[in-house]
UniProtKB/Swiss-Prot annotation:
The UniProt record lists the keyword Phosphoprotein: yes
Listed CDD domains: RRM1_RBM39_like, RRM2_RBM23_RBM39, RRM3_RBM39_like
Region called Disordered, residue ranges: 1-239, 435-474
Lineage: Eukaryota, Fungi, Dikarya, Ascomycota, Taphrinomycotina
Compositional bias of kind Basic and acidic residues: 190-204, 224-239
Alphabetized UniProt keyword annotations: Phosphoprotein, Repeat, RNA-binding
Any one GO MF annotation of this record: RNA binding
Family annotation (SMART domains): RRM, RRM_1
Residues found modified as Phosphoserine: S465
GO biological process terms held by the UniProt record: mRNA cis splicing, via spliceosome
Compositional bias per record (Low complexity), positions renumbered to this chain: 29-45, 121-145
Phosphotyrosine PTM sites in chain numbering: Y174
Pfam families in the cross-refs: RBM39linker, RRM_1
Name of the protein this chain belongs to: RNA-binding protein rsd1
Species this chain originates from: Schizosaccharomyces pombe (strain 972 / ATCC 24843)
Length: 603
């Protein structure tokens, strides 16, 4: 067969002719797929166009197109019927049984059942599926339309129940194909970014919730301000603690805490309870943060808490500490005062320094006697006596403490005018111990040597109380013997003390004679003086001086011509009724009378 040379030359450039029937069929399938892609894009604009699905049949023979042979530089879209394998090793496989063959993909974990897979071939007008670009017409015509409709209905219901499964499988199956790689990867990244943002937002919400909880815990912890517990010594804690008693049984520690908050910040408040029953014993201890709050807490004593007045006082440990401090201060004060100095109080106001010296000089040599006086040079009733020898001071203290002088019981103590609760006997015992210690330290003084006794040991002695029950007042006989400087001191044991004779005085005191509130006359004082003077002159004896003191006691002072008249007046007026009142009459020493009325001495 001879070929024309011109035909042979044009053969390589001539496009291969396709039969008319096959060409029409390909055009119809291509146009139908384009219309299906357009409708799918409008119905789901957010999803990428689905790739075509091959309907597998035993008679199907895969056909692959080569877009490079058609003169294309880039791959055409999937909608034109092209399909690209993921790798050179992947190929289409057919199953031996079943209506459709599954396509083997790398994402095997997302394999879906056969009845959930979507067929991308659109329906035809006659109820059958249109042939895909890779399938034959005969294979589609042999399938039942009813079975196709059932499969499509099941696929639509599955997509409605699982809206995300379609896109997920689509991305997994076709994300690596050339036409979908870039677009689907960007969609996947956007999806992952949204997921990460939502997870971070959830984490942020959780962190905010935890921060809110922490802030709430901090606020709740700040609702009861407390100091951070520091290591305090027991002495410091005792100084900050008060003892509270007379508390109600139903009182709680919180109520006690709030009550003492008005005195200052409270560190701790503990109610003492029974170990077995747990009931309150009515007492508590409250510890403050600062020592200044203790005095403010003591000021709350007497205020009512749950209807009961509370009693606030220092703890026993604090009381003992204050007692020790007071004793140390007393010893420091006594260290500055010689031990051979005495303090004498409750002395009659008319006695002078010479009178007191004459009374205390029989016990030993006196260096000085000094009575305290006011601005008008009147005695204040107390003073100091200093002996040369502490032994003399000891004897004077033992004998003269409590001695009755001019109607007054004198009080004698050591060193200064600060009186303690120590008795004279205990002081004398301590005095002897101190003196013995002093004599051991100075043996030369035991041989008759003189001593000034200015040692620090004597200065450390604390003053004694002048009011004590164990002291025995010196009798008048003993005092008179000492005053007379009798040499027969050994005969003191033979003397028999006689009862002290009553004080004879010309002065009398009448009490409860009147009531100033009931007197209405402007000259009632002069009138009362005249009435009492006339009655006493007539019944008891001559009155040389009388004075009415307008006070609540109703006192009238009367001085008679002699002591017998005064005693007679006291006997007759005592317990007598006068103006509806009972009179109280008593002898008044003349010294007291003259101290009160100095002009009565010349009367």
């Amino acid at each position: 067969m001879q070929l024309d040379a011109e035909a042979l030359a044009e053969a390589p450039f001539r496009k291969q002719e396709v039969p008319q029937n096959q060409e029409n069929q390909q055009k119809a399938s291509s146009s139908f797929h384009e219309s299906s892609l357009t409708s799918s894009t409008h119905s789901h604009p957010s999803n990428p166009p689905p790739p075509p699905t091959r309907l597998h049949d035993r008679s199907f023979k895969p056909v692959s197109k080569n877009y490079e042979s058609e003169g294309r530089l880039t791959p055409p879209p999937v909608s034109m019927g092209y399909r690209y394998a993921r790798s050179s090793k992947q190929s289409f496989q057919r199953e031996d049984s079943g209506y459709n063959d599954d396509v083997v993909t790398n994402s095997s974990s997302h394999r879906t059942p056969r009845h959930h897979r979507r067929s991308y071939s659109p329906r035809s007008d006659y109820g059958s599926r249109s042939p895909s670009p890779h399938s034959s017409v005969d294979s589609h015509q042999s399938r039942s339309p009813v079975r196709s409709r059932d499969r499509d209905r099941s696929s639509r219901s599955s997509r409605s129940r699982h809206p995300s499964s379609r896109s997920r499988h689509r991305y997994d199956d076709y994300s690596r194909s050339p036409p979908y790689s870039s677009r689907h990867s960007r969609s996947r990244r956007r999806y992952e970014e949204r997921s990460s943002r939502s997870s971070r937002a959830h984490d942020y919400d959780y962190e905010d919730l935890r921060d809110d909880d922490r802030s709430h815990e901090r606020k709740r912890s700040r609702s009861r301000p407390r100091e951070r517990s520091s290591k305090l010594s027991e002495e410091e804690r005792d100084r900050r603690t008060v003892f509270v008693s007379q508390l109600a049984n139903r009182l709680t520690s919180r109520e006690l805490y709030d009550f003492f908050e008005q005195a200052g910040p409270v560190r701790d408040a503990q109610i003492v309870r029974d170990k077995i029953s747990g009931r309150s014993k009515g007492v508590a201890y409250v510890e403050f943060c600062h020592e200044d709050s203790v005095q403010a807490a003591i000021a709350l004593s007497g205020k009512r808490l749950l209807g009961l007045p509370v009693i606030v006082q220092l703890t026993e440990a604090e009381k003992n500490r204050k007692a020790r401090e007071a004793a140390e201060l007393a010893r420091a004060a006594s260290a500055e005062i010689p031990f051979h100095r005495l303090c004498v109080s409750n002395i009659h106001f008319n006695l002078t320094d010479e009178d007191v010296k004459a009374i205390f000089e029989p016990f030993g040599d006196i260096e000085f006697v000094h009575l305290q006086r006011d601005d008008q040079n009147r005695s204040k009733g107390f003073g100091y006596i200093q002996y040369r020898n502490p032994i003399s001071a000891r004897n004077a203290l033992e004998k003269m403490n409590g001695f009755d002088l001019a109607g007054r019981n004198m009080r004698v103590c050591l060193g200064n005018d600060k009186f303690t609760t120590e008795t004279t006997s205990s002081m004398l015992k301590r005095f002897d111990e101190t003196l013995a210690r002093q004599e051991r330290s100075q043996p030369s003084q035991r041989n008759g040597g003189s001593s000034t006794y200015e040692s620090q040991d004597y200065r450390e002695a604390a003053p004694l109380s002048p009011t004590e029950e164990e002291s025995r007042p010196i009798t008048r006989d003993e005092l008179m013997k000492k005053l007379a400087r009798s040499e027969d001191i050994s005969d003191n044991s033979k003397l028999v003390s006689e009862p002290e004779p009553p004080i004879r005085s010309r002065c009398a005191l009448l009490e409860n004679m009147f009531n100033p509130a009931e007197e209405t006359s402007p000259n009632w004082v002069q009138e009362l003086e005249q009435d009492v003077k006339e009655e006493c002159d007539e019944k008891y004896g001559k009155v040389v001086h009388i004075a009415v003191v307008p006070n609540e006691l109703g006192q009238i002072f009367v001085k008679f011509e002699n002591a017998d008249f005064a005693e007679k007046a006291i006997t007759g007026l005592h317990q007598r009724w006068f103006g509806g009142r009972t009179i109280k009459a008593s002898i008044l020493p003349e010294t007291d009378y003259y101290f009160k009325f100095p002009n009565a001495k010349t009367a």
